[in-house]
Amino acid sequence: MTTTAATGAENPGVHPRFAEALRELGIEDLVPQVRRFPEATRTAAEAAAALGCELSQICKSLIFAAWGSPLLEHSRELGGGVPVLVLMDGASRVDLELVRKELGAEKVTRARADVVRETTGYAIGGVPPFGHRTKTRVLADRSLLGHDVVWAAAGTPYTVFPMAPRDLVGHAGGTLVDVRELTA
């Protein structure tokens, strides 16, 4: 599978919400760098294969729900799982216990698909690291810093963009943490 620029007559361009986020952040010059896949890439492995990059160069944007954290407003309310965005390299898995400890939460789970869409405005597989409908707490795993450039979803499962990891974390308003699952 190859990629093409996400602009032009045959490509409708980047997701409107994501394009607006780029303008608001003053980085609209990134739009020509957005790449479009001919087929959806809903996993990090599919995206890495299509781009011809290492799996760990893919930045996954994952939404979790946290309960009972003194750091998250409304997380102690009845049914109050508060969405939290975790940015993780594509070769690694998130350790929920480490996320729970980082947030001081009682419980952390993977968010349901409807919560992901409601929180971010994007479908799973296309969630970018910034430009969401609502402001969420962002945790970025340090493993992302192992590359000069990482690729992240640009609002759809068909589009990605490149960015230096520190810039990406900064634009996302993320806090660098160690929440990667360690293998035995």
Where does each model-flagged region fall?
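Extended, low-hydrophobicity, polar/charged segments
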Residues: 1-184
